[in-house]
């Protein structure tokens, strides 16, 4: 073998290739390219160009200028690149319900038709004509701006068919033939003459009539204004056909269906547009562009400060963890909001940073300059009370809230009883003998205690306005209602005529025999004495008398 090194040919290892001839770039008017992208009508876009609101390659655009593929266009803070259409046109049929507007963004927050449409990549839906918020029916949308402009332009005379329900003018039962004739010939509206190319009565009732109408223009609310010019009121309006495309019967409201590609090609041929994919420019959004970051202003004791809240990163997931710490919690000190003594808000730190902050921020000194609060009050702060003892209830050293002297013979009146002057209770008999145990009624109306009978717990039942506490049962002290009655029957009966109850009738009511209302010195009543009351009077009823049945 020869030791001579082999020389490699550089031509064989070259990665260069013969470049193909560059295709000529498309060039179109700027307002046409913007309309092709669905950013508005050509007339409105021309006005925006004249106002200097659009830039091309960093310079303010001029009216009538052209752009080529690859140019950068800025509009409303967004950046686009002009590029040729490579996909075929698509057309969508949407059955619009009431309550939706045909705009991309509504300042009043109403729902739009674009919220219910399929999502596109690299293009956008363009509405072919508009329907107001109360009009329903067929709405066509396309990705081809040239097709949309041709179908909307009056020079192409594309038919729009509507079904309308009309109320006759006031004082008339139905829409007259004279009104139909005038609308067929044409009437003068605010923006010029208008007419129905076709009008046909298709039904009606006693209150309204149904018509089928056809127009070849797309003015704002043209169908409604034509009927209103004759004094009629439109109560229902639905579009059923646009050109050769009709609304499918099976398509529900709020739903959409895409038109077959062969029908789209036929529609373009009918409008005398070129076949295949349209050789036109459109706008593609710049990938990865950042919108203006939203910010908020925090007003604190030190003044105003801006804070980053939520920037649009066009799908950058790695920024989520960083955005979590954008909103900082403010740790307030003892001074509170708006007080000069409080600590400043910020992050909670520890370690060396906390040590440095403690050296920079000494403790607050008390004194006249800082507003000396004075010495603390003497005594136990817990001894200050924010409640008051009700009248008639005493407090004592015992654990019960109503602690006080208890036992026989206290003779304390019921705090919830109605106090009044003592007097005689009307009745027919003499005084009843003293009860067993010896309690009697004094002149003041209060019940006394004697050594023979203990206090009752609730002799009159629990009053409606009296508080009841669990401790009243757990630790009984003084009870304003009396002590509990001893268990068992009392020793001995109640002396008096007729056994335990008086013989007289005890029907309640003023003037009743043996009864009567309370009152001092009632007629026929004996004066009440200690330990007795008139027989048969008061609240006691004799057996077999009064309201008790035999």
UniProtKB/Swiss-Prot annotation:
- Which residues act catalytically here? 132
Q: Where is the composition biased (Basic and acidic residues)?
A: 317-334
**What Enzyme Commission number(s) does the record list for this chain?**
5.4.99.22
Task: Name the PROSITE patterns for this protein.
Answer: PSI_RSU (PS01149), S4 (PS50889)
Q: Which reaction does it catalyse?
A: uridine(2605) in 23S rRNA = pseudouridine(2605) in 23S rRNA
Q: Which domain of life is it from?
A: Bacteria
Q: Return one GO MF term.
A: RNA binding
UniProt-annotated stretches for the region Disordered: 294-550
Q: Which GO terms describe its biological process?
A: enzyme-directed rRNA pseudouridine synthesis
Family annotation (CDD domains): S4
Any one Pfam family here would be PseudoU_synth_2
Function, in words: Responsible for synthesis of pseudouridine from uracil-2605 in 23S ribosomal RNA.
Family designation: Belongs to the pseudouridine synthase RsuA family.
What is the protein name stated in its UniProt record? Ribosomal large subunit pseudouridine synthase B
- What is the organism field in this record? Xanthomonas axonopodis pv. citri (strain 306)
């Amino acid at each position: 073998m020869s030791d001579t090194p082999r020389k490699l040919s550089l031509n064989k290892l070259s990665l260069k290739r013969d470049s193909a001839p560059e295709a000529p770039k498309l060039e179109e008017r700027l307002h046409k390219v913007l309309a092709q992208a669905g950013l508005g009508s050509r007339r409105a876009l021309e006005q925006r160009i004249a106002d200097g609101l659009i830039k091309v390659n960093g310079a303010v655009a001029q009216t009538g200028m052209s752009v080529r593929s690859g140019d950068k266009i800025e509009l409303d803070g967004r950046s686009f690149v002009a590029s040729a259409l490579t996909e075929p046109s698509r057309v969508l049929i949407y059955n619009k319900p009431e309550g939706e507007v045909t705009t991309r963004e509504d300042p009043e927050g109403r729902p739009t038709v674009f919220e219910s449409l399929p999502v596109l990549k690299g293009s956008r839906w363009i509405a072919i004509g508009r329907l107001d918020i109360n009009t329903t029916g067929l709405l066509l949308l396309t990705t081809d701006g040239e097709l949309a402009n041709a179908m909307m332009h009056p020079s192409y005379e594309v038919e729009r068919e509507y079904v309308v329900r009309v109320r006759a003018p006031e004082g008339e039962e139905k829409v007259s033939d004279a009104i139909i004739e005038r609308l067929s010939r044409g009437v003068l509206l605010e923006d010029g003459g208008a007419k129905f190319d076709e009008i046909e009565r298709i039904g009606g009732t006693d209150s309204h009539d149904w018509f089928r109408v056809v127009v070849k223009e797309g003015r704002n609310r043209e169908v409604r204004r034509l009927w209103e010019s004759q004094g009629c009121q439109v109560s229902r309006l639905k579009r059923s056909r646009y050109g050769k495309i009709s609304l499918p019967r099976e398509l529900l409201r709020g739903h959409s269906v895409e038109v077959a590609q062969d029908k789209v090609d036929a529609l373009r041929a009918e409008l005398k547009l070129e076949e295949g994919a349209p050789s036109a420019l459109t706008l593609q959004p710049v990938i990865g562009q950042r919108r203006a970051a939203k910010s908020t202003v925090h007003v604190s004791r030190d003044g105003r400060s801006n804070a980053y809240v939520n920037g649009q990163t066009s799908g950058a997931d790695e920024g989520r963890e960083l955005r979590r710490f954008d909103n900082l919690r403010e740790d307030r000190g003892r001074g509170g909001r708006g007080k000069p003594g409080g600590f400043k808000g910020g992050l909670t730190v520890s370690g060396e940073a906390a040590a440095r902050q403690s050296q920079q921020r000494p403790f607050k000194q008390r004194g006249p300059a800082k507003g000396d609060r004075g010495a603390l009050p003497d005594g136990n702060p817990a001894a200050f009370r924010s409640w008051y003892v009700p009248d008639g209830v005493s407090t004592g050293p015992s654990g019960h809230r109503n602690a006080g002297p208890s036992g026989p013979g206290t003779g304390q009146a019921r705090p919830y009883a109605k106090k009044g002057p003592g007097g005689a209770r009307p009745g027919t008999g003499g005084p009843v003998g003293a009860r067993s145990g010896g309690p009697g009624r004094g002149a003041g109306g209060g019940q006394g205690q004697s050594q023979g009978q203990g206090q009752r717990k609730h002799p009159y039942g629990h009053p409606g306005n009296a508080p009841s506490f669990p401790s009243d049962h757990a630790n009984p002290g003084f009870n304003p209602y009396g002590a509990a009655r001893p268990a068992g029957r009392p020793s001995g009966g109640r002396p008096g005529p007729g056994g335990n109850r008086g013989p007289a009738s005890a029907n309640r009511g003023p003037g009743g025999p043996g009864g009567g209302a309370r009152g001092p010195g009632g007629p026929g009543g004996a004066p009440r004495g200690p330990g007795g009351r008139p027989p048969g009077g008061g609240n006691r009823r004799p057996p077999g008398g009064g309201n008790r049945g035999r």
